[in-house]
Amino acid sequence: HLDHHKDMQEYIDAKRNILIHQVPPCREVLGYENEITRGMQADCKGKQVWFTRLHETDNGAFLRDDGMLCMAEDGVVTPFLAQKDVKLRGLHNIENLLAAAAAVWGEVPVEAIQKVGSTFTGVEHRIEPVRVLDGVTYYNDSIGTSPTRTIAGLRSFNQKLILIAGGYDKHIPYEPLAPEVIRHVKT
């Protein structure tokens, strides 16, 4: 999204502006692990629902310690999908699925959420398997154009990778990427 904003602050302000202008019965889906998002809580005028893979919540979608994706409404918890049944790679995709479930819960049948969560295999350019050649699988993650997205992609694999990266400077910090490259990339 930074391709459409002059810097990170403008992007944050645009997101905050959406929250400020929403009114009930609008649903505001907020990521609990993101401290910037948590800081926007006071700007919310609609119904707040959270998504989190590290904490349980009384209102929103979360990943329970036993590996179940759950939805809570006023403290009533409904497990809806086992993490092991999700086809997408990476914990960031678990977070995406939790956010999607929080956004549509009560508007679409739970069975539809379960079906999508257990059958959807991804979109082009996002950790997309491209080819297997001589026992090596090649993935296209060209959508990963920021350090955060590149880190999420690297963390999606259990083995060290060969990374081919490039792009242009978006004027955001790249320092968090260095230890992840050391940890996840073959040298």
Language model features by range: what are they?
Residues 1-4, 38-84, 123-126, 130:
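Extended acidic/charged loop-beta regions that coordinate divalent cations
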Residues 1-32, 36-46:
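Phosphate-binding loop of NTP-binding sites
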Residues 7-10, 42-45, 63-65, 153-154, ...:
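Short, glycine/charged-enriched secondary-structure capping and boundary segments
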Residues 23, 45, 158, 185-186:
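Residue-level detector of structured alpha->beta connecting loops
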Residues 31, 53, 166-168:
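Cofactor-binding loop segments of dinucleotide-utilizing enzymes, especially the Rossmann-like FAD-
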Residues 55, 184-187:
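Short, intrinsically disordered, charge-balanced linker/junction segments flanking boundaries
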Residues 80-185:
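Nucleotide phosphate-binding/pyrophosphate-handling subdomain across enzymes
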